[in-house]
């Protein structure tokens, strides 16, 4: 029962961790710049990987019958709909969520304080987390991930170069 509560708490925590770009305009200049915003579809991927892939066999069988199948669909559908280049950023985002959650569990800290931006300095994602995500997501979702994702550190992959959907939020300026 305690394990189920912890897994449910992890799923809830994962739904508020990844970033998606949106655009804001500085007042008076009308210039836009990209800012991070939660991206729910990648949260589902990290929750799926942590709850359904990394749990012991007996627990994963129980989850598979209920929520794992739904989480897999909610993860794979958006991943299949974005460009191959944007998938590299998505893989980094999922890896960073998992890394931050594991760090928070180790140190007993919350993952992200309310009102904090996701654009804190990017920490290097440990190789084992990145490898697990790169080995699992493409085959699980039947999508291709560019080869350079396996060799390029996440901290150097900027969302600005990829065709990640953006929305404009302009306060006092025109975008």
From Swiss-Prot:
The keyword Transport does not apply. InterPro entries: Bifun_inhib/LTP/seed_sf, Bifunc_inhib/LTP/seed_store, Glia_glutenin. The keyword ATP-binding does not apply. GO terms for molecular function: nutrient reservoir activity. Disulfide bonds: none annotated. Keywords: Disulfide bond, Seed storage protein, Signal, Storage protein. Residues 1-19 form the signal peptide. CDD domains: AAI_SS. Contains 7 disulfide bonds. Belongs to the prolamin family. Seed storage protein. Not integrated in the gluten polymer through disulfide bonds, unless incorporated by reduction and reoxidation during dough making. Increases dough strength and bread volume, but decreases dough stability when added into a base wheat flour. This is Avenin-like a7. It comes from Triticum aestivum (Wheat).
